Amino acid sequence: MRIGILTHHYVKNYGAFLQMKGMYETLQRLYPEAEVRVINYVNQKHWRRNIIHILHFRPGVDTLSTYVEKIRQLRTFTKYERSIPRTRSVKTAKEIIDLKLDLIVLGSDEIWNLCGSGYHPLKFGTGLENQRTIAYAPSVGAVTEETAVPEDVFSGLKHLDRISGRDVESLKFVERACGRKAEKMLDPTFLYNFDMDIERENIKPKPYRYILIYDLSLIHISEPTRRS
């Protein structure tokens, strides 16, 4: 059995990598005899905006040493990213079909975010209607009930063999877009235990108690909040 995962595997942030890793490892556990691969489809516009954002030198914030450290971190991140097996590079639905996959999994991450630069009908299954395709816990991100739904996502959503989302807004979107009821499913980052990876990389626990806040935007935290 050959399984392909269509997701934002090329996006350089921790959440994107962890959901891909969680999905890959979970599918390998469920189907140990299967060949599981990430479908190497890259939306070039999305990739460029992401990488430019990372490599941008911020005057007054970055210094030469912090910028060098940023590049080092990017190289380390890319090493882990590429540890997940992927297919040959594909650019169209036909090229994905030519991979002759037995199952295509769409998700998770914000692959259904109509408002972002990563939008493409392919991520909704459009062009893959005759393939065995399911959507596992994708998200619409910033999409709301007021967001217009492009007609070219309808066919893909309508023909998915199974359909789910990871949040309420995604379930609402599916019903509004194609009239189907989607199931709410757990994000794949919660399906896989990363402890073995942490141990293998010899990552030591911090010698103090802390709360980790992961956010893609810079949020001002007041001093009283910081102290508490």
Regions found by a protein language model. Give the residues of each.
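Single conserved hydrophobic/aromatic residue that forms the stacking wall/gate
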Residues: I219-S228
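Aromatic- and Gly/Pro-rich donor/ligand-binding loops
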Residues: I3-Y14, L18-S155
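A nucleotide-sugar donor-handling region in carbohydrate enzymes
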Residues: T87-L101, W112, A137-R209, D215-L216
